[in-house]
Amino acid sequence: MMKTVNELIKDINSLTSHLHEKDFLLTWEQTPDELKQVLDVAAALKALRAENISTKVFNSGLGISVFRDNSTRTRFSYASALNLLGLAQQDLDEGKSQIAHGETVRETANMISFCADAIGIRDDMYLGAGNAYMREVGAALDDGYKQGVLPQRPALVNLQCDIDHPTQSMADLAWLREHFGSLENLKGKKIAMTWAYSPSYGKPLSVPQGIIGLMTRFGMDVTLAHPEGYDLIPDVVEVAKNNAKASGGSFRQVTSMEEAFKDADIVYPKSWAPYKVMEQRTELLRANDHEGLKALEKQCLAQNAQHKDWHCTEEMMELTRDGEALYMHCLPADISGVSCKEGEVTEGVFEKYRIATYKEASWKPYIIAAMILSRKYAKPGALLEQLLKEAQERVK
C-alpha cells in the first residue's frame, strides 16, 4: 500500500539530509536518509501528478542536458522531470558548440548556466572519464557561483557514467519498494544481478554496478553472477561487500546463472562487457584506432557466443522462489526471437513481466525530479506541503 502525500511529507521532514549541499553522482556517497529522501520526494511527486496537482516549483529556468551516448528512456525521463518542475530543457550538442574548438570545461559549464537550475550528464563510454568529467563540471559550477558569475548553483545529476547509473538504480529501488510494500520488506530478499548473453558488445558496466552498489544498502541478499572474465570494476565490488556488512545483508559472487537464480526473489539478467575489455576499448577509442576497435569487437562477440546458455528462460525462472521471482531490466532488453535471434531473455518471460518493467521504468522521471528538487531546496518536505496546500490543477 503506497503512502499518502501527507504521510510521505511527514517522513521527509523526519529525515536528516544534506542533499541540498551536494550533487547526486554515486548512490554510495549518499546516506540512507538521503536515499530515502529521494525515494519519498519521488513518490510524493508521482502521487501529486496522479491527483492532477501541479508540481511546477520553478516559474522559469533551464535544465541543460549533455548526452555523450545514445539514450531514449533517460533522455525522455530527464525532459519529463524538468517539465514536471517547471523548467525548460536545452540540449548541449557538443559537436555544434565551441567545445569542438577547444573551449574548456570550466568555461562551458559557466556559459551554459547563467539561467540554469539543473544540468544532467550522461558520459559512460570511457572508463575512468565519465564520473571524473561530472566532478570537473561540478567544481566549475562551484567556482562560478562562489565568484558571483552564477546567481545560483545548478543541480548536477548523473544520468549514467562509467561507474554508476544512479537514476536507474534508484528508479529500480523505488519500483521494488512499491512492489514489495516497503524498504523494510526488502531485507533478506534475494536479488540476482546476472550477466546474460547479448549479440552486441560494449554494454556499460554501470547498471550492474549501480544495482550491487545500492541494493546492498538495504539488507538484501545480493548475488552477482557472470561467466569467468566478465568482472566489474573491483572498487565497486568492494563497495558492495562493505555495504552488505553495514546493512546486515549479504553479497556474493558466483559463476553460475542457475546458482544465482535458485530461490531468488528478484532477477536482473543483463549483458555487460568485461571490465578488462572496457579498459582496452577506452584506450582504442582515445587513440581513434578504428581497426583495433573492429578487432576487439570481433574478439568479444566470439567470447560472448561461448555463453549463450546465460539466457533467462522459463526453465531458469522455475529455479527462483516458487518459480515467481520478479524479473527486472533497465530496457531495452535483448529479447530472443523479437529484437534479436538469441539474446538475454525469451519472449515468453519478457511478455510475462513486460508491464512490470514498464512500471519500473515509469519511476525514473520522478526520481530525477526528486534529485533536482533535493539539491535546490533544503526543505523539500515544506515545499511539497505548499504544493498540496495550493493544489493548483495541472489540467483544468
Swiss-Prot record:
Family annotation (Pfam families): OTCace (PF00185), OTCace_N (PF02729)
Domain of life: Bacteria
GO terms for biological process, alphabetical: arginine biosynthetic process via ornithine; citrulline biosynthetic process
Keywords recorded for this protein, A-Z: Transferase
Residues where carbamoyl phosphate binds: 71-74, 98, 165-168, 330-331
InterPro entries: Asp/Orn_carbamoyltranf_P-bd (IPR006132), Asp/Orn_carbamoylTrfase (IPR006130), Asp/Orn_carbamoylTrfase_sf (IPR036901), Asp_carbamoyltransf_Asp/Orn-bd (IPR006131), Carbamoyltransferase_YgeW (IPR017702)
EC number: 2.1.3.-
Keyword Lipid biosynthesis annotated: no
A single MF term (Gene Ontology): ornithine carbamoyltransferase activity
Coiled-coil region(s): none
Keyword Nucleotide-binding part of the UniProt annotation: no
The protein's assembly and partners: Homotrimer.
Family to which the UniProt record says this protein belongs: Belongs to the aspartate/ornithine carbamoyltransferase superfamily.
Protein's name in the database: Putative carbamoyltransferase YgeW
Organism field: Escherichia coli O157:H7
Lineage: Bacteria, Pseudomonadati, Pseudomonadota, Gammaproteobacteria, Enterobacterales
